[in-house]
């Protein structure tokens, strides 16, 4: 079911509906909601199933997680602070982040800490990789906060100098969330509500799961396809995420109807700033033309150029920007376990498309295909000249499968022939608890059934839950298959032994941006120390202290013995 203006020119017609259901079948997506904004007209429609157990259908007002589409709201709110020189003159794009949250924002080197600006963290040019597996949902036995995530960055390495390359980083938008809350003294969701959602009439948009569940509109269930073939899907329900620590990086829950109001406002900023669709007469939005232009201005080049775009993509502030078929487009996607969202808008034509769906990863594949079907329709692109988005994502899935299948040769191109027959010690000797101050705990267990080492990081403990299965390759070198919801990847792993022949550390290639040779070294800890660390009894050195500690440990100890040194 859906809603539309009273005219016959709907782009969501019967022909398009057939394409939607073909996409749902191909990409194994239970359901999807779509909105189209064309100047002053908006059409919304739901297709498929929101809840398989109850056979509840997707409606135009069904709620979905929006994932990283949250970032555009965070960037817009930050831009409002930058523009408000009366109350926040100390908040400018060039302001170093450490000047505003000095005790919390510390990177691995004092120069990097001092040099990283607000603009840098919002445009993915800090040189820091994502380190997504490092984020814990629990800190010292309590629900992790944005401050906890920010304070963990001091233990994580950079991949490039600042402002030299684009590296997408969720954690930096968590930094932005913490900065905004610290400067204003208010929760991010309250600020979103007052300055964006209420003025635009976005009455079904939330930043907390409990608020969405308590609302009037149904929240779709998320799913992952667990079938091993391309045949009928075997959907497994994915629990709703309650992750306040991801905040302005990806916690939003909304509907395509509300997002249509957001997209319309971004393309018509003066209208949105001079009037409000909220019944609250005190609700005003600061979404000015200057702010909309600011967040949509290219800041960081995203290499390399990619077909079918005419120009290299660039990252703005919460948006990607590029030229497609002769028009400039702003886009962003969002993905979170069980859900995926796509937003695209052509400001010059005041045309936008939003999709929200309830499958892991494939929501974005299918959503993108449908977004560009609608854009091509709007631009009048002949069928024979249209780019094959379905083939693009089919090839991408094949590339991911090939990468996993050939991981051993990729990570270990100089293996001896034949490989060394076994690790130095019996596998049981490597089992135990390992710790890294940024990545937390990893407990290795030997499974008697398959004779392999395994580790599990649950959703109750970590923002990104995963299960690791270790395969011996040669000597003390392994690969680890890292299974997450709806997908898996392979990373290198190796053990370091003490002179006495005791396992002292495990090095894992958690972060691909650091290169194939670098490992995150997690040191082995005993039960007493593990308990202390899990209670949060560890120091959080300022950058100067961290730098001295780094240099001292590097000079005096083997690198694998340090808790925050990466090699």
Curated annotation (Swiss-Prot):
Keyword line: Hydrolase
Domain of life: Eukaryota
UniProt keyword Nucleotide-binding present: no
Record note on disruption phenotype: Does not affect the production of unguisin A and B.
GO MF annotation list: hydrolase activity
A Pfam family matched in the record: DUF3471
Catalytic EC class: hydrolase
Metabolic or biological pathway: Secondary metabolite biosynthesis
UniProt cross-references to SUPFAM superfamilies, sorted A to Z: beta-lactamase/transpeptidase-like
Function text: Hydrolase; part of the gene cluster that mediates the biosynthesis of the unguisins, gamma-aminobutyric acid (GABA)-containing fungal cyclic heptapeptides with the amino acid sequence cyclo-(D-Ala1-D-Val2-L-Phe3-D-Val4-D-Ala5-D-Trp6-GABA7) for unguisin A and cyclo-(D-Ala1-D-Val2-L-Leu3-D-Val4-D-Ala5-D-Trp6-GABA7) for unguisin B. Within the pathway, the hydrolase ungD catalyzes the hydrolysis between the D-tryptophan and GABA residues of unguisins A and B to produce the corresponding linear peptides.
Family indicated by similarity: Belongs to the peptidase S12 family.
Protein name per its UniProtKB record: Unguisins hydrolase ungD
Organism phylogeny: Eukaryota, Fungi, Dikarya, Ascomycota, Pezizomycotina
Encoding gene per record: ungD
């Amino acid at each position: 079911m859906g809603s539309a203006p009273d005219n016959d020119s709907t782009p969501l017609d019967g022909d398009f509906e057939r394409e939607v259901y073909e996409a749902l079948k191909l990409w194994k997506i239970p359901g999807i909601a779509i909105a189209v904004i064309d100047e002053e007209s908006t059409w919304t429609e739901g297709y498929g199933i929101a809840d398989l157990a109850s056979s509840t259908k997707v409606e135009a007002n069904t709620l979905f997680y929006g994932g990283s589409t949250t970032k555009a709201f965070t960037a817009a709110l930050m831009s409002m602070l930058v523009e408000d020189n009366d109350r926040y003159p100390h908040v400018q794009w060039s302001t170093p982040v450490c000047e505003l949250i000095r005790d919390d924002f510390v990177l691995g080197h004092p120069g990097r800490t001092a040099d990283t600006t607000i603009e840098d963290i919002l445009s993915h040019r800090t040189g820091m990789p994502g380190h997504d597996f490092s984020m814990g949902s629990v800190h010292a036995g309590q629900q992790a906060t944005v401050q906890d995530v920010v304070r963990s960055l001091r233990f994580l390495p950079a991949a490039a100098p600042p402002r030299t390359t684009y590296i997408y980083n969720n954690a930096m938008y968590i930094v932005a969330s913490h900065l905004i809350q610290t400067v204003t003294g208010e929760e991010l969701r309250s600020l979103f509500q007052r300055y964006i959602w209420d003025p635009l009439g976005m009455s079904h948009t939330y930043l907390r799961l409990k608020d969405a569940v308590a609302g009037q509109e149904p929240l779709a269930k998320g799913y992952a396809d667990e079938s091993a073939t391309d045949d009928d899907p075997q959907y497994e329900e994915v629990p709703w995420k309650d992750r306040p620590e991801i905040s302005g990086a990806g916690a939003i829950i909304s509907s395509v109807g509300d997002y249509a109001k957001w997209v319309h406002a971004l393309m018509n900023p003066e209208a949105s700033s001079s009037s409000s669709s909220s019944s609250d007469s005190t609700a005003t939005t600061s979404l000015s033309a200057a702010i909309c232009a600011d967040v949509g201005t290219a800041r960081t080049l995203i290499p390399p150029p990619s077909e079918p775009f005419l120009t290299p993509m660039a990252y703005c502030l919460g948006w990607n920007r590029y030229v497609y078929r002769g028009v400039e487009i702003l886009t962003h996607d969002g993905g979170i376990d069980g859900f995926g969202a796509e937003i695209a808008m052509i400001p010059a034509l005041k045309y936008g498309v939003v999709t929200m769906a309830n499958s892991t990863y494939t929501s974005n594949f299918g959503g993108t295909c449908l977004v560009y079907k609608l854009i091509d329709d709007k631009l009048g692109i002949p069928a024979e000249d249209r780019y094959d988005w379905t083939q693009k994502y089919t090839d991408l899935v094949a590339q991911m499968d090939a990468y996993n299948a050939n991981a051993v040769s990729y990570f270990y191109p100089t293996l001896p022939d034949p490989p060394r027959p076994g690790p130095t010690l019996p596998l049981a000797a490597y089992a135990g608890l390992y710790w890294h101050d940024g990545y937390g705990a990893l407990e290795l267990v030997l499974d008697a059934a398959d004779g392999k080492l395994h580790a599990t990081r649950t959703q109750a403990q970590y923002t990104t839950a995963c299960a690791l299965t270790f395969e011996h390759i040669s000597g003390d070198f392994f690969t680890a298959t890292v299974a997450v919801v709806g997908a898996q990847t392979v990373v290198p792993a190796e053990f370091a032994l003490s002179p006495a022949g005791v396992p002292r550390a495990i090095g894992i290639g958690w972060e691909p941006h650091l290169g194939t040779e670098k490992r995150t070294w997690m040191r082995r800890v005993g039960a007493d120390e593990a308990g202390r660390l899990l209670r949060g009894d560890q120091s959080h050195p300022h950058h100067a202290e961290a730098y001295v500690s780094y240099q001292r440990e590097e000079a005096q100890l083997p690198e694998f013995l340090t808790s925050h040194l990466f090699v």
